Curated annotation (Swiss-Prot):
This is Forkhead box protein I3-B. The lineage of its organism: Eukaryota, Metazoa, Chordata, Craniata, Vertebrata. GO terms for cellular component: nucleus. One of its GO terms (biological process) is epidermal cell fate specification. Residues 130-224 bind DNA.
Amino acid sequence: MTSYESQGQSPTRCGPQFLSLGQEPPELSLYSDSYYPPPSLPSPQRTNPSSYELGDYAASSPNPYLWFNSPGMNSAPYLGGTPGPAGPSFVPQHYGMQRPYLGPGPPGGPGGELSWFSMPSQEDLMKLVRPPYSYSALIAMAIHGAPERRLTLSQIYQYVADNFPFYNKSKAGWQNSIRHNLSLNDCFKKVPRDEDDPGKGNYWTLDPNCEKMFDNGNFRRKRKRKSDSLPEKSSSGGNESGDSNGRGSPKSQSIDISTSPEKGPSPASTGPSPCLSNFLTEMSGVAAGSLDMEADPLSRPFTLSLPVDGAQRASQTTGFSTFTPSTTVSDWASPLPPPPPMSSSPSHSTLAYSGPVLSQFNGHFFPGLSSTGILYPREGTEV
């Protein structure tokens, strides 16, 4: 019986017992009964209580740093005694765990490097991603890059396959599309071979009138406007119309000359568009108003709409000064004008019922609104 009681009181000597196991770190010897009182042992044969194994608690913990065994982990905060130096994690089963997908973390902190995930190279991306060009644009690129500005059908195929690896997967589909675009698009002209030029097949070249449709790798289906292609003609026509309409007025002639593109670009063309300018102006005004409101919200006038009649209508625009918690209401409330002389007419009897109107306002936010301020009740009237 004596041996059973000594074993029942064994939790007070739990430190030396756990140190003898050789599995847990020495921080477990600081485990105190005041935080987690151990249960009584059911039988004398049970020598190692499982309630002190922190592996059961840490196994279900969602803390991801237990998987990295980072040097930045300190001892648990609920362990008694002075905090020791930074050491390894107190989870025994995680010491020798194999981590095939996690590489060594950086020296600055925890975190594993996913060595199995590799970013594709530029060549792989070009094979996977379809080029953002139409078949007409591809043909125009090939012909425009040739020294003599003409290519055969096989040379166009070769150019597309060499510069865009995406089309190497299935050649039948895109080659058929290129043949259709060559035959159906009027911008591509067939040129016969010379007699002294050996080979098979005709050359394909670009129509000189369609070369302006090729802009920055994008081949337009529609031609440019005459105003875009011939800016000088449009400007000269504008000057002639200005002279005919404003004949005899030097002011209109000076305006036409100053705005003509031949004399040089106007300042408005280099600046933002009118829509953008209006938008920026409006936004700057809104921003300035919001800054004023944030700086002193109580100093702005507050308008209160109340059912007050004619001559007895008080000033509805009241200015408030800034509020500080250390001052009282009488110190920071702004002075109000004296009440005007009251009339005994029954039309002003509504001014006497100022209590329900003022009850909906909080005195902390609107301290200047009182029965002696904006609303002037009749003398001798019971509220």
